[in-house]
């Protein structure tokens, strides 16, 4: 009898381990059957996928970081994440508000006096962070190459719409927010990101400028004809699309958004600000950096919210007054691309579930969303409305 009682805990532990191992194997097979065909269809050299579910992190790596030396992708491979940098920039701006350095209601001119007399002088920092300043374009014109030409561009810019009435997705818009947030903290943007925000989030291998010692981990992106690419320098590139990171760090950021309780109070408040809804654009609610949808959500609705029209065209926007705090059932997401990289992240707080997909090929957003939605469905059978 004594022996039987002693073996019971061991047996239960073995059964529990077997159950976890089976769940891991099932998840591995679901991710494999989604990612491998995706890579084949779009000629993607390498991908890193990271999933957090019920507090557990899972990592899945495919292909190579570099075609020349066939270095395998790992969870430590550094990828360019393009505009998936924007939620990090937004978190910095929200942290600047949480620590009393600025408020999102401030005008751009309050923090950049050189804008005095321009159409952007009275645009709010919230307008800049939600792409509602009146129609700033996706990219700067080619002749904006230095701080002087950037200021000249902002000073002569003419709005298409009254501020706060339309959303036009824009690097010069949120890029200015990031620049002014860092300025309010008294440091250059790369310094405050690498020296303060990344460490506070536990992102120990995330960079604006990849240090020499980390270059062996930095993947090459690839063009459609498999020529190696790295992001091209440009004005406010760091603020709008400049983060290089790995799957582990990006999953930590997603986990911080799912469960910020372990972070300092100012950072908790900042993350809540990025989840707040400020404008409604169709079925999407624009937060700071993150874009929010009611959950569950169909594949078609999620693809529509990440369509070329949403990235390239002005869309009517309805201001939410007061701003709308995070509903109980929401999905947050953001895509990101550079010339040779494609990234995507989503998380669903009510399901304690998050996903990061990093690739060294800029492939269509619709394909990223389809793959992510398939994995989401494997984890939550109610992910799509019935």
Model segments located where?
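Short, surface-exposed loop or secondary-structure junction motifs
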Residues: 59, 66, 118-332, 337
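Short, conserved catalytic-motif segment at the N-terminal edge
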Residues: 24-79, 103-106, 110, 148-156, ...
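Short, gly/Ser/Thr-rich active-site loops of penicillin-recognizing serine hydrolases
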Residues: 282-284, 295-296, 362-386
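Active-site SXXK
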Residues: 35, 49, 55-57, 78-105, ...
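N-terminal signal peptide c-region/cleavage motif recognized by signal peptidases
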Residues: 16-18
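Short, well-ordered beta-strand elements
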Residues: 334, 342-361
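Cleavable N-terminal signal peptides
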Residues: 10-11, 21
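Bacterial N-terminal signal peptides that target proteins for export
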Residues: 1-9
């Amino acid at each position: 009898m004594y022996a039987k009682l002693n073996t019971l805990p061991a047996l239960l532990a073995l059964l529990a381990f077997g159950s976890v191992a089976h769940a891991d194997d099932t998840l591995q097979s679901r991710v494999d059957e989604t990612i491998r065909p995706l890579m084949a269809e779009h000629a993607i050299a390498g991908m890193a996928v990271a999933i957090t579910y019920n507090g557990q992190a899972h990592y899945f790596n495919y292909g190579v970081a570099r075609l020349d030396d066939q270095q395998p992708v790992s969870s430590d491979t550094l990828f360019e994440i393009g505009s998936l940098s924007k939620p990090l920039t937004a978190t910095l701006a929200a942290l600047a508000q949480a620590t009393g350095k600025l408020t999102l209601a401030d005008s751009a001119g309050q923090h950049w006096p050189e804008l005095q007399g321009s159409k952007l002088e009275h645009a709010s920092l919230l307008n800049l962070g939600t792409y509602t300043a009146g129609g700033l374009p996706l990219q700067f014109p080619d002749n904006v190459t230095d701080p002087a030409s950037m200021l000249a561009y902002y000073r002569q810019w003419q709005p298409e719409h009254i501020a706060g009435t339309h959303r036009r997705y824009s690097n010069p818009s949120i890029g200015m927010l990031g620049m002014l947030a860092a300025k309010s903290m008294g440091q250059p943007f790369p310094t405050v990101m690498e020296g303060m925000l990344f460490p506070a989030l536990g992102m120990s291998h995330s960079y604006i400028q990849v240090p020499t010692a980390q270059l062996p981990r930095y993947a090459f992106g690839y063009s459609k004809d498999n020529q190696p690419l790295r992001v091209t320098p440009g004005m406010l590139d760091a603020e709008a699309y400049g983060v290089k990171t790995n799957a582990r760090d990006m999953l930590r950021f997603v986990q911080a958004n799912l469960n910020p309780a372990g972070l300092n109070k100012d950072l908790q408040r900042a993350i809540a600000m990025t989840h707040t809804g400020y404008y409604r654009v169709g079925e999407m609610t624009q937060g700071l950096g993150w874009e929010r949808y009611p959950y569950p959500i169909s594949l078609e609705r999620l693809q529509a919210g990440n369509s070329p029209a949403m990235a390239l065209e002005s869309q009517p926007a309805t201001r939410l007054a007061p701003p709308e705090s995070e509903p109980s059932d929401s999905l947050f997401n953001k895509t990101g691309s550079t010339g040779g990289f494609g990234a995507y992240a989503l998380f669903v707080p009510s399901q304690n579930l998050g996903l990061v997909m990093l690739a060294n090929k800029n492939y269509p957003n619709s394909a990223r969303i389809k793959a992510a939605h398939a994995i989401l469905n494997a984890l939550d059978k109610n992910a799509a409305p019935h």
